[in-house]
Amino acid sequence: MTIAKELLIKHEIPLPIEDELPLGGEIVSQYLAPLSSLPEFKPHIHLNSKVISIGRKGLDKVKTFGREDIPFVIHVQEGNAFHMYETKAVIDATGTWQNPNPIGSGGIDAEGEQEAKNQIYYGIPDVLGKNRKRYEGKTTLVVGGGHSAINALLELAELQKQNENTKLVWALRKNTLSEAYGGKENDALPARGKLGSRIQELVQTGKVIVHTPLYIHSIQRDSNHKLSVLGVKDDENHMISGIDEIISNTGSRPNFNMLKEIRHASDPSLESVPELAELIDPNIHSCGTVRPHGEKELRQPEKNFYIIGAKSYGRAPTFLLATGYEQARSVVAYLTGDIESSEQVQLRLPETGVCSISNVNKKEATDNASCDSEQLEGKTTVGCC
């Protein structure tokens, strides 16, 4: 980040305002786009390029002798052409956003999900911009209980103010809505806490119909292209009908297809980098606090190959951009020979979120939390997990 800042200053490009919290599009327009256009970077950036596979030159995964001395080969499709690049090291920062989880509650497609895919958006659509016509005056079901779902609902609520025929429906698996609201004003990340407060206010107005806990198993479409979602709620069959569009925010997972010839490891449940699993497991850490980590924790069986960023967290939902920046800094420092710098993890994350002992087994929380046991005696403990 320091080098990027120095280069922007060198080329007299205005820096983003440090005290503002940018939206995703603003990160691109104010920071990534100007940075990528600089002569120091532009020749080395390949857009519209898909990595097909990564491996060692002339060796498959089985071969060991001399493996660490042989360069990596990256096979890339760029438009209609195919290219190969040899490299000393590979950092996989491809994320998980393009590999969303399905709507089915068991981690697999709901019956009929593929047939209804033209009416399902995976991710957060630009509700008030380019996707406006898709949702204005329609009944939209948002599936998911995390911050992405909350963002989508809040955008739809703004659209509802402009067109009262816009209807909002929310389906999630959480036992209580308070779990979705999170820490609110007690969250050490104020902007995230505000999301919880805003969605609670929206629910209390009655302008969004909530179905929870709902475990979806199938989606049906009638002759008028209206969707019905079927599942189980409170041990009984439950159906939501009259749906025009579905926004699916059920999380995402890593895709390892391009790594078939790389010796890589992942946690069996989270699909995260193994050394991170205990730090980020949502079964243990309900509030998402993760201690700082760097190159050492991110090492893979394949020397000089690393998975960083959201993909390093696998299916865990608690990744923060600041974590990824520090991961990248530490790994690059190590690869360039600055071992001392790579070991000095500079990031200090705030104690994020709120641990509710009512939602976590008390003994388990005590055994795994990083706070002392006296803190756990209260019903709610700020930032203890």
Per-region residue spans from a language model:
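Cofactor-binding loop segments of dinucleotide-utilizing enzymes, especially the Rossmann-like FAD-
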Residues: 145, 171-173, 310
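Glycine-rich dinucleotide-binding loop and its adjacent helix/turn
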Residues: 24, 31, 92-162, 168, ...
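Glycine-rich active-site loop/strand segments that organize a redox cofactor
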Residues: 1-31, 111, 119, 123-129, ...
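Short glycine-/acidic-enriched loop or helix-start segments at secondary-structure transitions
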Residues: 101-103, 152-153, 180, 257-259, ...
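C-terminal, flexible cofactor-proximal segment of oxidoreductases
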Residues: 212, 253, 268-385
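Mid-domain beta-loop-alpha active-site segment that forms a flexible
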Residues: 30-32, 145-155, 194-198, 320-327, ...
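A Rossmann-like FAD-binding core segment of flavoenzymes
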Residues: 42, 49, 53, 157-268, ...
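Feature captures the FAD/FMN-dependent oxidoreductase FAD-binding
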Residues: 12-99, 210, 217-229, 242-245
